[in-house]
């Protein structure tokens, strides 16, 4: 009767991912966060379509919406109307809704690419340090300590100030996006690296690693075919939790005029411009601020739920 049910049907086991999905489906808060994340991605992807239907081009001026004496939008609460769902910017009358929608593209693109870079660097460094140990582990761990102690914000401001308008065959927004991805990703990899190193230290003592060694498997094969698949869950969890941190960092850099430059819309850049007008045009600051808040909250809720689903012991 082993392996058979009462009616003779075979009992099928469930994989880690099936079990995790079952747990995640029961977590309504995480599902809500995941739904918002998916919605934000769709907004970023289809920004031109959304703006064409509901707004105006993000760089288009609308001086007819501006009071010529006060230089602020006509009407209540920053000129909110059916044509301008989030109101208009002071001075030039650009559509705040369109700029918030297009700003999601920059924020999410930089956050995802920077997270990908940091995960690649951190995973490779963490696996090598945890598997080999000894002086290799010491060297990589001390390198992580140096990066973690580095004043990242000051470095970003200094580097962005000396980078020319054209470099490495890139220019304009493309160059600034690449610069932000490099700065954020290159200096945040130790956070992932430390976590993966700890997991690798535990895995290298497991029986399947000893079995692979006894069968003559070389270190690269053990690293990439035995250890990495077993590290997929923590990599996915902490990547999801790193994305909102990178969104905040990109917004901070744009707020300080270090990131993508105007007139290209970014959430942090809009907040920076809004500091001069928040008393008389609060919508200019409110909506990009809400966009950052909702995005970061959604990613954190989904990441926490994903962590609980894949590793219930972390609760």
Regions found by a protein language model. Give the residues of each.
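Generic hydrophobic transmembrane alpha-helix motif, especially the helices
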Residues: 84-86, 117-122, 130-131, 136-201, ...
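Short alpha-helical transmembrane interface motifs in multi-pass membrane proteins
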Residues: 106-110, 125, 141, 178-182, ...
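Non-cytoplasmic
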Residues: 154-158, 162, 181, 191, ...
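Residue-level hotspots within pore-lining transmembrane alpha-helices
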Residues: 105, 147, 151, 186-190, ...
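Gly/Trp-centered helix-boundary motif
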Residues: 1-119, 123, 127-128, 135, ...
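Amphipathic cytosolic juxtamembrane alpha-helices at the membrane-cytosol interface
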Residues: 94-109, 113, 133-141, 201-205, ...
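Transmembrane alpha-helical segments in multi-pass inner-membrane proteins
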Residues: 161, 165-167, 172-175, 179, ...
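Transmembrane helix-loop junction
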Residues: 52, 130-131, 161-165, 198, ...
């Amino acid at each position: 009767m082993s392996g058979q049910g009462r009616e003779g049907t075979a009992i099928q086991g469930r994989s880690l991912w099936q079990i995790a999905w079952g747990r995640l489906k029961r977590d309504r808060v995480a599902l809500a966060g995941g739904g918002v994340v998916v919605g934000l991605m769709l907004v970023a992807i289809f920004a031109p379509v959304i703006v064409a239907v509901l707004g105006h081009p993000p760089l288009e001026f609308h001086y007819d919406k501006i009071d010529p004496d006060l230089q602020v939008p006509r009407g209540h609460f920053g000129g909110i109307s059916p044509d301008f769902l989030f109101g208009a910017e002071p001075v030039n009358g650009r559509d705040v809704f369109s700029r918030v929608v297009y700003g999601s593209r920059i924020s999410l693109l930089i956050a995802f690419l920077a997270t990908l870079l940091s995960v690649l660097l951190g995973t490779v460094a963490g696996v090598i340090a945890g598997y080999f140990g000894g002086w290799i582990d010491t060297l990589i761990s001390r390198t992580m300590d140096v990066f973690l102690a580095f004043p990242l914000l000051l470095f970003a401001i200094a580097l962005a100030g000396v980078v020319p308008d054209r470099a490495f065959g890139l220019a304009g927004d493309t160059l600034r996006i690449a610069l932000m991805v490099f700065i954020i990703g290159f200096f945040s990899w130790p956070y992932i690296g430390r976590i993966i190193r700890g997991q690798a230290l535990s895995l290298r003592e497991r029986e399947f690693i000893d079995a692979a060694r006894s069968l003559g498997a070389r270190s690269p094969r053990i690293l990439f075919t035995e250890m990495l698949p077993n590290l997929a869950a923590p990599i996915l969890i902490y990547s999801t939790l790193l994305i909102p941190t990178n969104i905040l960092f990109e917004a901070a850099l744009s707020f300080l005029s270090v990131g993508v430059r105007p007139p290209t819309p970014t959430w942090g850049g809009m907040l920076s411009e809004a500091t001069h007008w928040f008393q008389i045009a609060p919508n200019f600051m409110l909506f990009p601020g809400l966009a950052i808040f909702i995005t970061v909250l959604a990613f954190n809720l989904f990441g926490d739920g994903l962590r609980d689903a894949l590793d219930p012991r972390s609760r």
